[in-house]
Each structure stands twice: as C-alpha cells, then as structure tokens.
C-alpha cells in the first residue's frame, strides 16, 4: 500500500484540533524522551515496556493506529508476520509524517482524520485498532469520548479488538509531578482528562463492545474491547 493523505471531514472542532496541534516537529523530536522516558517513569508510573508488551499481546496483521505519536510502539512491537497492513489515523500531519517514515518498511497508509466525527474512509476488514494515549488528549468528558469507539468499530472484522491506554484524571494515583503536568496540560488544551475516570471508561466500553477488560497501572488505564 502506498502512503496517501485524505481528509475525513472538511472542518474539525477547535478543541480537538488544539490537542493535535501541540505535536509540532520540534516536540516530536523529544517526545520519546519526554513522554515515554520521563513522564511514563516519573509522573504516570507506567513503564513504557508495559505498553509495548500490551501492543505485542493485541496487535494484528491488519491494524489501524489512531493518534500515532512518533510511531514508537509500531516500530518496536512484534507483528504476527513481517508484512502487516497498517493504516495510520491522526489529525496532525506531523505525527503521520514522522510515524510513516519511522515504519516505512511496512509501507503504511496515512489518513488525516478526526475520530470524534463519523469517518468517511474506505477501510474494512481490520483485526485490531490501537488507541495509545489518545482518549486523554480529546476534549469533553469520558462518556462523550465513547463516540470514538462507535466511529471505529465499522472498520473491524468480527472478533476484532480495539485496545489502548489513557491517563485518567480521577480515581487513580497522581504524584506531585503527575498533578502538575495534568493541570498544565489541561490548561493548555493538550489534555482533556480532568474528569476522566475508571467508571466512565467502563461504561463506554460496555456500551460498545461484546467483551472488554481494563487494567490500571499507575495513572494509566489499559483497555481492550472486542466486538
């Protein structure tokens, strides 16, 4: 598959765009060190290796990744075969460019898309969708973010899974660094997770999936939903 860019909609909400816009090329250059190194270890108390293990457990040969960051996990994870089909979805062309370049050996297809809106994409027959560190960057409360699952489910085969991680704002341990970072990032519009909690995450998973599971490590919820 060749790389291509297509818009899922003509307009996007200001709040959703604010979170995506923070990922400039300069920020992405230090993202792995700042987020996957420092923040995961010292703020969220969720080692990056555990997220990589999570990817290895649920990744498939036909995979969509949403909110792609730098592509670290797609680069490091172990796909079931050496020739997976990968689609990348994000609002930010910078993250798509960086990730597509990083995993160019897989020749991914890229789409600029807002998952809070219906997705007019000709994608079907996928077995896994990854949402790593996406939900806490979206505006609104956790219950309103259930629309993301609704919009993505049509792209999955029967038995397919949506899996991901999200930093919760309530009901999980937050040390001083985590509290400061959460407050600052919400103020700047990078995060939208002040009111995100475990019970609401359970609710939107239950509403959208035949089966689901959640595990909390530090300030981070790991979730899987199967259709």
Regions found by a protein language model. Give the residues of each.
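Short glycine-dipeptide loop
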Residues: 156-162
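Core SAM-dependent methyltransferase catalytic element
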Residues: 208-227
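A short acidic, Gly/Pro-enriched loop at the edge of an enzyme's catalytic core
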Residues: 120-129
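Residues lining the SAM
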Residues: 132-136
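C-terminal alpha-helical "lid/dimerization" subdomain adjacent to the S-adenosyl-L-methionine
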Residues: 163-214
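Class I SAM-dependent methyltransferase SAM/SAH-binding core
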Residues: 62-118
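Conserved class I S-adenosyl-L-methionine
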Residues: 2-58, 72
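A short, conserved alpha-helix within the catalytic core of class I
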Residues: 138-151
């Amino acid at each position: 598959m060749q790389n291509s860019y297509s818009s899922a909609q003509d307009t996007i909400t200001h709040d959703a765009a604010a979170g995506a816009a923070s990922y400039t090329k300069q920020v992405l250059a230090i993202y792995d060190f700042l987020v996957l190194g420092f923040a995961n270890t010292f703020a969220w108390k969720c080692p990056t290796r555990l997220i990589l293990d999570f990817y290895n457990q649920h990744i498939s040969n036909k995979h969509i990744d949403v909110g792609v960051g730098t592509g670290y996990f797609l680069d490091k994870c172990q796909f079931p075969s050496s020739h997976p089909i990968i689609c990348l979805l994000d609002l930010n062309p910078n993250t798509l460019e960086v990730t597509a370049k990083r995993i160019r050996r897989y020749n991914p297809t890229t789409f600029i898309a807002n998952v809070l809106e219906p997705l007019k994409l000709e994608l079907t027959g996928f077995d896994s969708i990854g949402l790593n560190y996406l939900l806490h960057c979206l505006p609104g409360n956790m219950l309103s973010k259930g629309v993301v699952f609704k919009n993505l489910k049509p792209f999955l085969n029967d038995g397919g899974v949506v899996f991901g991680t999200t930093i919760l704002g309530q009901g999980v341990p937050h040390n001083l660094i985590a509290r400061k970072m959460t407050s600052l990032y919400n103020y700047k519009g990078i995060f939208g997770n002040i009111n995100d909690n475990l019970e609401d995450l359970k609710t939107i998973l239950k509403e959208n999936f035949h089966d689901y599971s959640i595990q909390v490590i530090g300030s981070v919820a790991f979730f899987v939903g199967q259709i």
